[in-house]
């Protein structure tokens, strides 16, 4: 059961789609419950490049994101429309849905990707005072980072909470360099909020004229607004592309850049996930053996290690530090093959099939 608009540019929708595909691929019947939101004129399975299809049930009443009272009503009607008496297992990210499933004693897995601070008062009351996460109907609680696990163990959960970092579903392929490129293609994929470091990429591109920069993400309007103040020709903007097109675009990139700021906002440019983030795109970069240049945020150290599988920038607010590393890479990218290979091997082993198998193992 998912609350997310689908298909859409939201990472949560992509992760849910790929999870359902993997469960279907290993032989289980899947019914995904969704609100009637998202880019409904586009084919869901084509948008996410899904080969192993599954049933989708849309609740027509909810033609916009379920909020307020509709948040609670959506959970209730989702379970009702799922033919709950015949379902063996549920998976959800929604606290209230988990609460209702526990009330009717339906076994389920609860995935947590965010801090509880973004939830409403009633949900906080359910978790902190009623201890709903300790209910026996929850077979497993999964967080995407150790920092998030530590946050929730404060509410008394110990035995059934595990960490499963996000994982990529892309085909694994590592680019080989037979000679050093004259110009590096440096790429960013994702939201173009300032917290994701778009201003830093623009600033770097203006100074570093020897390389090309590519930004994939945001709406056409957002891109037009940004380009008004840019005159250099070595930076290229493209609006959000469907996941089915990511592999091809990413294959042409040499260095993937993630210049996060100390505060990382989410959809709507709100909140702060800098302590708990596990970016899905990071694992896509690794799966294709890309050299990753990233801000050194503590939470990312759960997966990224400086000069082992990535290059991490400590003083990430200073463009000179980024330029210094880019200059070193430009001199000889082959020198970084060992770092790229380490990232590639990790993502190849810990792919979305591996993650799904761990999720469903009891």
What are these regions (language model features)?
Residues 40-49, 53, 57-90, 96-104, ...:
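An amphipathic, basic-hydrophobic alpha-helix
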Residues 34, 113, 131-132, 136-174:
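Donor nucleotide-sugar binding/catalytic pocket of nucleotide-sugar-dependent glycosyltransferases
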